[in-house]
Curated annotation (Swiss-Prot):
The keyword Transport applies. Pfam families: ATP-synt_B. Keywords: ATP synthesis, Cell inner membrane, Cell membrane, CF(0), Hydrogen ion transport, Ion transport, Membrane, Transmembrane, Transmembrane helix, Transport. It comes from Histophilus somni (strain 2336). It is found in: Cell inner membrane. One of its GO terms (molecular function) is proton-transporting ATP synthase activity, rotational mechanism. It is a single-pass membrane protein. The gene is atpF. This is ATP synthase subunit b. One of its GO terms (cellular component) is proton-transporting ATP synthase complex.
Length: 156
């Protein structure tokens, strides 16, 4: 195989072309590729961080929802407890009022019974005196009648 001048010229031209590409063309291409790799790596890292943050946020939201449910249940339980307390207080007050009304009724009945009893004593005493007057046949003086009535009322 003969090396002639054309082949040597082509080798020199190719070497200059390779040197030119390595010096001026290759670095910007490599730089663009590396920058694109960094950009993709950053995007993947950001996506992974966002996914992790979304997962963490989801857990926090679920915890907050559970806490809100627990708090709501506590409020409902407290309201039910307070309602029951109020109902119990109302029952106690109603029972006390009922007892008071019954006592007042008994007192009124007792008072009325005593009044009627006193009226009855006076009428019985008056009838006894009237009967005694008829038996004796004469009228005893008024002061003596009142004394006798008072004594009879006290005895009855």
């Amino acid at each position: 195989m003969n090396l002639n001048a054309t082949l040597i010229g082509q080798l020199i031209a190719f070497a200059i072309f390779v040197w030119f590409c390595m010096k001026y063309v290759w670095p910007p291409i490599i730089k663009a590729i590396e920058e694109r790799q960094r950009s993709i790596a950053n995007a993947l890292a950001s996506a992974e961080a966002a996914k992790k943050e979304q997962s963490d946020t989801k857990v926090l939201v679920e915890q907050e929802i559970n806490q809100a449910r627990i708090k709501a249940q506590e409020i409902v339980d407290l309201a039910n407890k307070r309602r029951n307390e109020i109902l119990e207080e109302v029952k106690i007050e109603a029972e006390a009022l009922r007892e008071k009304i019954i006592e007042q009724g008994h007192a009124e009945i007792e008072s009325e019974r005593k009044r009627v009893q006193e009226e009855l004593r006076i009428k019985v005493a008056s009838l006894a005196i009237a009967g005694a007057e008829k038996i004796v046949g004469r009228n005893i003086d008024e002061a003596a009648n009142n004394d006798i009535i008072d004594k009879l009322v006290a005895d009855l």
